[in-house]
Amino acid sequence: RSSDLGESGSGKSTLMNIIGVLDRQTQGNYYLEGQDVNGMSDEVRSAIRNRRIGFVFQNFNLLPRANALKNVMVPLLYGEEHSKNGKEHAMEMLKMVGMEDRADHRPNELSGGQKQRVAIARAMINDPAIILADEPTGALDSKTGHMVMDLFHKLHEEQGKTIVLITHSQELAQETERIVTLLDGQIVADNGGEH
């Protein structure tokens, strides 16, 4: 578990977009699971984004007209696993985050914490190597935010997921093993995993 810490404009979103294979870096190399990502075609990069990276956003980015189950299944539409096994797998993901009883609820029928848990289930559906969480507790109250962070800790400890938390909150960053601090697009501090 690591966090990229910095104020607005520090470069956190740019770094997230590079790690998430949304943007290309202008210099240096980026290796994901031993592969140089920069030299890959857009088609291969898109497949990597879908299969190896899960995204969790502050504002959830759920489809308003789709229920929780269908929201979790969205990444499967772009992959190889479709309807039959996909529905069962999506229910497993909802169960993992404690939301199986809300599978038929639309986002407007869910609390902020419930929406974020659905978003985490969606991020996990393709068994990604990395979960990028951009201010995942920013729209939540303190108690619900701690519940979401506990879920990230569990995913890291029990499933070995790499969680990269993008935040401006020093308090939230302290809950991670490694803190990388950005300022004006530069890394100004990296605790290397030691607090």
Give, region by region, the residue ranges found by the protein language model.
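ABC family nucleotide-binding domain
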Residues: S3-L182
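H-loop (His-switch) and adjacent beta-strand-loop-beta switch element
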Residues: I179-G192
